[in-house]
Structure formats: C-alpha cells, structure tokens
Amino acid sequence: MTNALLLTTGAPTPMPADDKQVKGISPFDMSAVSHVEELGPVGAGEPMEPYDASPALRIRHWNELVGVIRAFLVEAQLPDTIGLPDLVDYLTVKSRNPAVGQHITTPVNLTAWLFMIVRALQPRIVVESGVFKGSSLFTMRCASPRHKMFAFDVDFSWLTHRFDAVDYRERDWGLDDVRAEGPTDLCYFNDHVNNCLRIRQAYERGFKHLVLDDTPDLGEIRAYRYPAVPTVSMIVSGKFQDGDAVDWVWQGQRLRYTFRSEHTFGARELIDHCHPIPALRRWTGLQDSNAYYVKLK
C-alpha cells in the first residue's frame, strides 16, 4: 500500500519513527540514485550566482543565449549586430551594478535586454522614466556611453549611483519637453503609468523605439498593485472591450481595473509593431519581466 501511495501522490506515507529507522527510509528514496555531488557549505559572505559551469560549457551556453537574443532582434526588426563580446560586456556591467537584483528594481533579465537593445540601436538619446534605485539606468548608461541620457523620477533619493553624464530631472516625464533627435532614439518606461499615455507622449515627441515594463495581461496582473493599465498587451490583443473588468487580490487587498477606450489615447493606431520581451530565465536563472518592445509609426 505504501508504494502505491507514493506513486499516486508523489509523497511518502508517514511511518512510525522506529519503522523509519529499521527500514532506512528517507523522503528522497523515490529519487533512486542521485548523481549530484555535495561540495560542502557556502562560506559566509561568499557571492553566489544562480549557477557556475566549466569554461567550455559556459561558452556554449552563452553562445546559445546570444542566438536567442539575435533571433528576437531579427523578429523585432532591430539591427542584428549583437555577438558574444556584447554579452561578456553586459555581464561585466552587471557585476559592477550596485542596484542590480535589489527588491522591486528592474528585473535582471530585462536589464540584459535593455543593454542589448541600446547596443543594437546606438541611439543619440535615451530616456528612462521611473528610475528608482537606478539598476536599468546604470545598465543603459554603460551599454553605449556616447548617447545623451535623461532620467525622470519624482524622487531620486533611492538612487544607488549617479553619473555625471546623465541629466536627472526630478519630475514626471509628461511635464517635460525632451524630444528625439534621431530615428533610433529610445524611451524606457518603468513608472507604472498608463502604457497608452506614455506611447502617445513618446509619439508626439518623435520617439520611435520604446520599451515598456509592467505590461501584464490577465494571467500576470495579480503580481501588481499598480500595473501600467491599460497596458500594451491589453490593447494589442483586441479582446478588451469597454466596461470589461478584471478583479484580483494583491497582498490581501481586492483590486479591480475596468477597461475604458478613452484611456488608450489612440495608442494602438500609433504602433507599427510590438513584441513581448522574451524570457531568459532558462539561460540566466534570474528574474524575467512583463515588458514589451514597441516600434512606433
């Protein structure tokens, strides 16, 4: 009976302590023979990445990741100029980034995408709205140090690092007049403000390339107190109609969002094409995001 229960429930039936000692049963007996070697405890303060690998395997793994990045750039009609040296550069920048991986900063895998998109576009101007501790700001500044960079937030007191070559503006992006100077200039919005409003504002200021974070669809919205609704995913899917409501629970609080077409500012008609930013956790072991790359007309 015990073996049958193990196979159907996936967990061993509790046994008296003395029976366990006699039969030598442990919770891991169903794993049969383990090929994982124990190397001992981690030292106090020892930095640990999600994994390490032998050098040859690491290079093969990185090359596989570069292939994923390049495939997305092709799909998004961006310059396909990224190679292994760019990934190595990103990893070096990531290791120096004082805010990377901190609580509620830009997900680490999205910082990788921002680095690669900036490298591919080589913009004259990069705008970030919603800086917080500066993880993504640090990443994009280091991706292409030649571009002008504008950082917008209503409070810069959380910043972990300041660059002399960044123009910090402590106000809402919507109240400013910074404009694109070239066709490859980029805006990154991580401010939890209506995606559609930001698209309209960027379009009116001449920007063609956008990355927008916090763009959940129905199955992802429960992770947010302040999703940037209506989000890109909501307007491009075509399934939302006026009055459609979404309810969810966030940290014990019931929330509701009701879709209204007047809140979209005609953003769908301004988009040439857009693409959800792919997940990279399989390769990095780190956090992904609900973000979109958007190309405007």
Give short role names for the model-derived ranges.
Residues 1-186, 193-297:
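A short alpha-helical cap/connector motif
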